């Protein structure tokens, strides 16, 4: 357990009972904050005051800056308390609220982000907004005090103008969500257009896409890998996709955006070379990037991809998990206080000298580019550790053996990491979010199979069982939060807020349950996936829109608060995989197992709803492209039956090469009976609980390969299995 540096302030406003880490961190502020809810809106309307809405996160550096500069300033607080009803929202806890006001502020100012600062009518419609405002005018931005007085004046003296602006903004975001995007064709050509849009932005020198700032885009990376490994040798995009995927993964893991000492990725890079990151670490980034590196190793057996994947798992295990109960924590902050910018993660040359003996220092300084002049604007002596060369390239350049350099690297890494652990540690938000945990479960189960890590499998299943027990009622209700981060003054073991699950929570959890069945053969996971998928359709799918909304329709006779009245159909990955393609993909997986054609029909209709516009989303359409591949390609199920070395060899062959439409499981023979496996597999493989085509006599292990609803005879030979799994087979 690592000590987090985070205040436990005395409550001075309406956040005294808040469960969210971000809201709890503001309890001491002189601003009379209120949580999002009926009471705050009723007060605004009864006093006819506009609302000041702050949306941020506990990991957000500029949120902390604005807190200290403005919200902890008594003069600013007096202005807010006099003229506004102040509402504070945690974007991790309420992604539905955040998404709508991000769209609104982007329509007003041309950009969104955190902190989000919006001025609303008493009923919650935005009439002005922006992101970070300094207390006093600088950075080309107006001072926050002047902004507050201006917005109060607009509401008091130019109310019609404010109401017209609010109506225009709401009409804009509702129009953007009411599009009819059908009209394209659901073919692999559409997938190619999405990939071509991403490849046009590929940076061949540094990897990644675009210039700066640079984000990883895991969805588009997996789509490029799918094209690189599963298209025919004459496909013109395959080679380009291969280069883009491998270059990007290599450059990211060598950059400062990757924690060279402990593993794990920071949120994004401020430069095109991946050197200087925003230092917060997010669970969802690391789980999706873990899948990228596992899939890369699965396909190309690249040792650096393996090393990065294992290091991500070790970092998550060490810092971001509840080892006893199961569960993955949400995030780690970038900073200790506002006067540093990633100081916990960075090093001056003198700091490195104090830890390393001369030989290791000489190596570390060259390998990680540690010098007198560093990389950070606030302290030019601070270096972000990054690698300009691989260890093999470094060995060739220096004349040393790679084995000797590996010894130096391991020793220097251990010493620097031990010294870093003595520093005050950035706060870890130990809130356990349902959707993000489902993503982590998927990543761990994939890694466990490909990398043969039983510990990852065991922890993923412990977490999945906890999710089923604590976030799901066993029927239609799934909560957004499994458990909040514990607090010394408010012990929290179960959610105090019953935040309903979003589409993404349901869709990611259905995927995790399907993966739970593939990992164990236990039918409880399969049956739960079916039940939750049905609930997802009932709650979020619209027959009129032929797509999924991100939240449930309001109950009859009720009106959603504020901008929640605008319905959203998420299709772009930003930053997690989008809800509609994720839900469609989950339904396609279940259709392949259950034979329930309505799942396929809904998935196809959903993808068709966006087919006329999705190619324009480029980097943000990776999940859509993968879901479309899954729709167009026959599912491939590989079931390895048996145990021992023969089964292990067959399983190793089966998992080689990533393919979106392929799933692999190893199962005990006693489960291969009617009722012991999903309906389609039972129909294809069994006849009156006996194999339709029995395995060879005496075979201790064999593989069953099913494409669609056609299964090959049992395979015992490794070479025959390789041939059966060729993309053109």
Q: Can you describe what each PLM-predicted range is?
A:
Residues 321, 469, 474-476, 480-507, ...:
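Long, polar/charge-rich, low-hydrophobicity segments
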Residues 59-63, 261, 265, 286-289, ...:
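Extended, hydrophobic alpha-helical segments in both membrane/secreted and soluble proteins
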Residues 230-239, 451-454, 519-524, 595-597:
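Short coil/turn connectors between adjacent alpha-helices in alpha-solenoid helical repeat scaffolds
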Residues 251-258, 462-473:
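Glycine-rich, acidic and aromatic/proline-enriched surface loops and short helix-turn segments
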Residues 1-450, 558, 607-729:
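Replace the tail clause
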